[in-house]
Amino acid sequence: MTKRYWNIDLEEMMRAGVHFGHGTRKWNPRMAPYISAKRKGIHIINLTRTARFLSEACDLVFDAASRGKQFLIVGTKNKAADLVSRAAIRARCHYVNKKWLGGMLTNWSTTEKRLHKFRDLRTEQKTEGFNRLPKRDAAVLKRQLSRLETYLGGIKYMTGLPDIVIIIDQQEEYTALRECITLGIPTISLIDTNCNPDLADISIPANDDAIASIRFILNKLVFAICEGRSSYIQNY
């Protein structure tokens, strides 16, 4: 895998608050190598390590995108939800940003059935099929469609398991991470100072609570994916 330059600037990361970890009482001792200091009761993340692992992650996603691989971005907490959907749409990735339904990957056959149902209902709605039904039946189907749109809208075009999963908050998305580990799907995960750095294939130490921090990391990864996709299209 070729190493590339991704213009990851330490001062820009500081302005985004990427270096602010959790309070010193809420930490995972395994994060010690990624912490540079304690300040006013919080741990400070070593941004040199952040830059190194973010660069590795960018190399990985660029390489995968240049070979036509598929990505899934997972971030369901309120702060991250809009950032995740916008980033995923920009890079033509699948995403989950509302709620992770247990077994979404490990029980893929069930997820596929839900997706087929979702597509059928969307087609029915577009062709005004609901208007031909009794009002009560139409209302039930509309509620079903709304629920499926909320939870599966970001993966509606997914036809198989993703090749790489990007996780925005390890603690929040632990179930998704465990499913990826079970299936052997490579993962990239933001890890704050209360996380376990040994679970994901590439762990990026960063503040996973601040919107600016999440945006900074996502923007770099999305840029790398888009660059990789351009390379894939040109070489196809």
UniProtKB/Swiss-Prot annotation:
Cellular compartment(s): Plastid, Chloroplast
TM stretches of this protein: none
Pfam families assigned: Ribosomal_S2
PROSITE patterns registered for this protein in UniProt: RIBOSOMAL_S2_1, RIBOSOMAL_S2_2
InterPro entries in the cross-refs: Ribosomal_uS2, Ribosomal_uS2_bac/mit/plastid, Ribosomal_uS2_CS, Ribosomal_uS2_flav_dom_sf
GO terms of molecular function: structural constituent of ribosome
Protein name (Swiss-Prot/TrEMBL): Small ribosomal subunit protein uS2c
Species of origin: Draba nemorosa
Gene designation: rps2
